[in-house]
Amino acid sequence: MIENLVREEIKGFKNYEVHSIPYRYKMDANETPFELPEEVIKNIQEIVKSSQVNVYPDPTAEKLKEELARYCGVVPTNIFVGNGSDEIIHLIMLAFINKGDVVAYPHPSFAMYSVYSKIAGAVEIPVRLREDYNYDVDSFIKVIEKYQPKLVFLCNPNNPTGSVIEREDIIKIIQKSNGIVVVDEAYFEFYGNTIVDVINEFENLIVLRTLSKAFGLAGLRVGYAVANENILKYLNLVKSPYNINSLSQVIALKVLRTGVLKERVNFILKERERLIKELSKIPGIKVYPSKTNFILVKFKDADYVYQGLLERGILVRDFSKVEGLEGALRITVSSCEANDYLINGLKELLL
């Protein structure tokens, strides 16, 4: 009986899967190897007390918005805070997408664009990246001209390929589009280039950011959107009243104010280049350039490598069964110890 009540879009639907696998080093989800900054840990009791968990959190996350606005060089009314950027993607769909509307996104890219498009009943147009995983801007523009998508996603840098789309090409796509263009800058801190400065020039632009990656707060689920006030008012109409819990708001605020970001990002960038250099010495594999905190690597036998790493306690992300990513594993840049262990593990398996 229940099956007859389920929406057609949900029947046969496969959600995003997160596997629980024992590991020694977790290098599969692009998380930071760093714990909370020491000054935050020292004051954790005071932080918990100040968050007043016995009352509902600030529904507008006003103090956090003010700090994020300072960080982005905008005003607080240009900021929308979500329970991870995943929630914001979902809210964009709720606010703007009717069943049958067209959503375009790069492929391969972040899986949640497709997941939430399916839930919304949208018509999906995946736009293939080039063979080298760079954006095919001409193909994107042709899709926009032909299908007039109501929503276009650009992941920059792109996950899981680590490739980027240039600023002038993003602007070209925004100008061509009559719909909303979402530029997902989840890995901005590792790249340095942004489109945030033109949010008030283009009414149809939303920039997504997160505190899960460079700031190391994946467990708190804090993402945010930067856009003009007119577009954000519709996200506020469809969001839950208390979507960011009190602890997340207070800890995120403290971490934003610590000033540890630059040092930690520099460490990841240095380790990323070291990993790329060392892995490139191993014959039979292809290491792709990256502007993120992960690298994409192709192997002749990805299953063998994945299982071999797993047996050594190293968990990486297997994309080898995804169309366009055949033979590929994605590896998070982690601590020196974890990176060394990975390099040695791959040498044992392949040399």
From Swiss-Prot:
CDD domains: AAT_like (cd00609). Pathway: Amino-acid biosynthesis; L-histidine biosynthesis; L-histidine from 5-phospho-alpha-D-ribose 1-diphosphate: step 7/9. It comes from the Bacteria. It catalyses: L-histidinol phosphate + 2-oxoglutarate = 3-(imidazol-4-yl)-2-oxopropyl phosphate + L-glutamate. Its cofactor is pyridoxal 5'-phosphate. One of its GO terms (molecular function) is pyridoxal phosphate binding. Keywords: Amino-acid biosynthesis, Aminotransferase, Histidine biosynthesis, Pyridoxal phosphate, Transferase. The modification N6-(pyridoxal phosphate)lysine is found at residue 213. It holds the Pfam family Aminotran_1_2. Its EC number is 2.6.1.9. One of its GO terms (biological process) is L-histidine biosynthetic process. Belongs to the class-II pyridoxal-phosphate-dependent aminotransferase family. Histidinol-phosphate aminotransferase subfamily. Homodimer. This is Histidinol-phosphate aminotransferase. It comes from Thermoanaerobacter pseudethanolicus (strain ATCC 33223 / 39E).
